[in-house]
Structures are given as C-alpha cells and as structure tokens.
C-alpha cells in the first residue's frame, strides 16, 4: 500500500496544512518517503469532535460485535505484516525478527481483549436487591457496573512501534472499554503508524463501526499533544514515554477546567538485587543473563535493568569481571533515533562526572549516527544515597552497580529508591529467607516483583501488572499491559430502583450471557 503521509480523521485520510516532516533511517541517516503533514489545530478539533459524536453509538454496540471488531483489527494487521514489518525496520532499525515477534504480541493482545469483551464480566456488575421489609428504613434496589469514559487520546511509544503504538495495548484496551480513540503517532515511525492505522480503518469498515471512533494524527512537536490533551471532548489520556513528557501531559490534564485522568507510563530503573549466596554459587551465569537483559533491544525497554545492587565480597569482584567481559563482547547497536542517543550519552557523561562513580567497562569510543556501545558503571551505597539522581533512568544499554557494605546498607538503598515498574531479586532459598525484609520494601516501590528472573519480558496475560508508583507511572493502580488495562477507561455508575427495561443488560435479572456478577454479596452467573 502506498503511504499517503496525511492524517486519518474519522477513518478517512485528510490532508491539511503546509508543514511536514519525514522519518529518518537510523542506520543510514537517509530521509524516508513520503513527507508527513503536521496536524494543525483544525485536524485535532475534527478528530476529537468526531470521537465524541461516535461515542454513544459505539458504546451501545453489542459486546459480540465489539469483540469481532477487535479480532478483525488483528487479522488486518496480520494481512499487511510483510509491509508493516519492513517499514518498521527501516524507520527504527529494530531487527525484523524482533518486529515479527512484536506484531504477534500485538495481534494476540487484541485477541485477549476480544475474548474479555465477549465474556463480558469485565464490567464488574454488582447487584444488591431491594429489601422493602427492612427496618427502620427499606433497602433500595442498587445495581452498579463499569461504563466507558469517552474519547481517549493515545500517545504512541517510540521503542515499541507496534505493541505500544497505533494498534497497541492502549488503543486496544480503550476500544475494548467502548471508548473512541484519537492516536498521536510517534514521529520517529510515521509510516509504520499509517499502515497500522489503515488496518484499523479496514476493520472499522468491515464491521460497520462508527468511523469517528478512530483518528491518527502526525506531529513532531509538543504543541499538538498539548492541544489534544486539553481538548474538551477528550476524557482520558494514555501515554508511554519519558518522565518529562508524561509529567507535562499529566499537568495539562490536571490543569483543565474539567480535569481528566492521564495514565502515563514513564521512567523506571528496574533495580536488580543480587544476594550473597547466589552470587557465590552462580555469579558468571547471572552476569551473562543480566548483560543479555541490559542490552536487549539496545537497552530501549522501559523494563531494562539499570541498577544492580549487591554486597561487597570476593564473589562480587568475580561477578563484576564477568559482567564487564560479557558487556565488552556485545556488538554496538543502533538506537531508534539520534535524539535518544544524545539523551543517553548526555546522561552517561553526567554520571561519569559524579565523584564516586567510575566506569567499569573499557569505555569504547562511541560511534557516529545512531550506533551506540553499551556501558557499565560502578558506585557505592553512600554515593548513591548522597546523590539520588544516580538512580534515575538512563534509557539505553547501560547499568550501574551499587556496592553495599552490609545487608542493612542494601536495605537502606532499597528504601531510598523512587517508584519502579519492576524490582528483581536473585537469591537462593537461604538468601531469600535472610532478606525477607527486602520484599516488604520492594512491594511499596514497584508494580511487579521478580524472583530469579529478569524484568525485560512482560507477559501479556490477565494477571500482568505493568505499572508502579510515581515516577514509574502517574497512577500506581493502573496497568498498560494485561486485561486490567481496560479499567483505566471505565468508571462505575449505580442504578437505583430502575425498572428492568431501563437497566443495562448486564444488570438485568436475566443473565443470558452468563457473565459473573456479585449478587447480594456472592459471585454468580445465574438469572435472578
């Protein structure tokens, strides 16, 4: 399919404005065709209003039709897989095999949400039947369920051009909830965005879905994003990216005359605690696994382990040598774009200027273009505690080892950390018993705790929680992966003393779809 380089507004391609930009091949530095038009305020306004105008019609569609629509988005993505993967490869430099896996994840994610919608229990129906004979006051009939919020603005991520982008988890969960979406595509891979957007449009047309439920806007600067978040028709925002970007959008959402929730997934250093006994028993193999995790995807994962905490010992010295040698064997990688590389090098250089921080690897010369070599740093607990910015996210293939003098000092380091997406602990059974206090600390700090594993894999399943306390996210109760992601875009409504014919189907006495409901305090799929 020939790329058009225009906005998609209410499922129609629309060209407006004279300003534009082109994607850049990170490997060659060449500009890629075509040029993409910058969204103007009129585009943003049209998209938001179209979403609002389609909301009631979309949310009232039968759940079965909504589920088929989600499945068909996955089918349309699969149908254009060769073209989609090829374009994503030249726009991001990510290997085609990695992109094929990411596409499969994206499609399976849509299928998972379709299954959830088809089953229907996600609306969390609760029924407390009337008790008119109750004294001193009769009990009313009260029934509650979750309903969609309204149009959602989705900001695509740069590091996952498929799974966290136009047809990714935020879009899938919003559509599953019954909310229209207006996507601001990531400017580093606009062609990939357009192809995914076309797949959604094809599914909309195939299923006779209101066209206003989907729009895709292209823009490089922050002005378009700000205009989208502050548009009065937008009811929620989903964002994956930097702390500065996410916080700016969060502040905009809060500053509106009618504030809206901004679910931003932002910075995380994903600490890994390596305990003494396992360090002595399995140091070299742990080092190999850690380096694999640190350098996976050129370190451009929000779950990349950036902080390794251990207690001083001879085994630690050997472990550090293994880390160093494994890291130095890694070939340079190509980062997503020059902006990410610049931020990485600026952060790395800043860390190396701090007294008490040293470089462990051989400090290979950094390369031109978007190529990068990984880095390994070392500091001690006191330096980290005196300079907490050391524990900030450095987005790229680097990690810093924090050497502690005792178990108590390791616990103090854990207590000093800000909110995280993940926290990992490697230890033997004896280690884990001896450091049980560590888990109590980490439970307050992170959204996902891992024992004897690495954080970079994020399984797409109902039990997954991909979130964490600030600054990992703006709302530690929310997740952007797994079926619970749908709850970001739902709110409860209670119906008191409603006649059956006015109640939403999930709250009526008859339960033909056999969804799970809480009835008078007990879970049931029965009719009443």
Located regions from the model:
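Rossmann-like NAD(P) dinucleotide-binding subdomain of oxidoreductase/dehydrogenase enzymes
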Residues: 121-292, 313-317, 527-528
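Structural signal for hydrophobic packing residues in well-ordered secondary-structure cores
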Residues: 55, 59, 74-81, 85-88, ...
């Amino acid at each position: 399919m020939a790329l058009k380089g225009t906005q998609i507004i209410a499922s129609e391609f629309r060209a407006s404005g004279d300003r534009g930009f082109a994607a850049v091949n990170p490997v060659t530095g060449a500009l890629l065709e075509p040029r993409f038009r910058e969204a103007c305020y009129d585009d943003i306004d049209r998209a938001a209003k179209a979403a609002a105008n389609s909301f009631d019609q979309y949310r009232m569609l039968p759940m079965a039709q909504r589920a088929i629509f989600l499945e068909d988005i996955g089918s349309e993505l699969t149908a254009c897989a060769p073209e989609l993967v090829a374009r994503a490869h030249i726009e991001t430099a990510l290997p085609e095999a990695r992109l094929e896996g990411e596409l499969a994840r994206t499609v399976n994610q849509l299928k998972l949400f379709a299954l959830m919608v088809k089953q229907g229990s996600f609306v969390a129906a609760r029924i407390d039947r009337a008790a008119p004979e109750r004294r001193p006051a009769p009990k009313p009939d009260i029934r509650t369920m979750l309903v969609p919020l309204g149009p959602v603005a989705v900001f695509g991520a740069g590091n996952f051009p498929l799974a966290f982008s136009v047809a990714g988890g935020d879009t899938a969960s919003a559509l599953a909830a019954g909310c229209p979406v207006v996507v601001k595509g990531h400017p580093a891979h606009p062609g990939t965005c357009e192809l995914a957007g076309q797949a959604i449009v094809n599914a909309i047309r195939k299923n006779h879905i209101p066209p206003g439920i989907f729009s895709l806007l292209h823009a490089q600067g922050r002005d378009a994003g700000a205009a989208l978040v502050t548009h009065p028709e937008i009811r929620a925002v989903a964002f994956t990216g930097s702390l500065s970007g996410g916080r700016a959008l969060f502040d905009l959402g809060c500053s509106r005359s009618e504030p809206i929730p901004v679910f931003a997934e932002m910075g995380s250093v994903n600490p890994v605690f390596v305990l003494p006994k396992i360090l002595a028993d399995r140091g070299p193999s742990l080092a190999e696994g850690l380096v694999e995790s640190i350098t996976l995807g050129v370190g451009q994962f929000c779950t990349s382990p950036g902080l390794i905490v251990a207690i001083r010992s001879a085994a630690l010295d050997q472990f550090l040598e293994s880390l160093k040698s494994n890291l130095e064997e890694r070939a340079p990688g190509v980062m997503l774009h020059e902006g990410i590389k610049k931020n990485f090098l600026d952060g790395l250089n800043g860390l190396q200027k701090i007294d008490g921080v040293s470089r462990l690897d051989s400090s290979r010369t950094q390369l031109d273009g978007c190529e990068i070599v990984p880095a390994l740093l070392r500091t001690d607990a006191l330096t980290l505690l005196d300079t907490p910015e050391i524990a900030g996210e450095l987005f790229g293939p680097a990690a810093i080892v924090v050497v502690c003098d005792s178990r108590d000092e390791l616990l103090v380091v854990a207590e000093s950390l800000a909110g995280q997406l993940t926290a990992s602990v490697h230890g033997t059974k004896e280690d884990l018993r001896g450091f049980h206090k560590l888990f109590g600390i980490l439970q307050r700090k992170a959204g996902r705790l891992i024992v004897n594993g690495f954080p970079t894999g994020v399984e797409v399943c109902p039990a997954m929680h991909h979130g964490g306390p600030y600054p990992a996210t703006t709302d530690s109760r929310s997740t952007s992966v797994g079926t619970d992601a749908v709850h970001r875009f739902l709110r409860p409504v209670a119906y008191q003393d409603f006649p059956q014919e006015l109640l939403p189907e999930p709250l009526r006495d008859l339960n033909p779809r056999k969804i799970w409901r809480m009835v008078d305090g007990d879970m049931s799929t029965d009719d009443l």
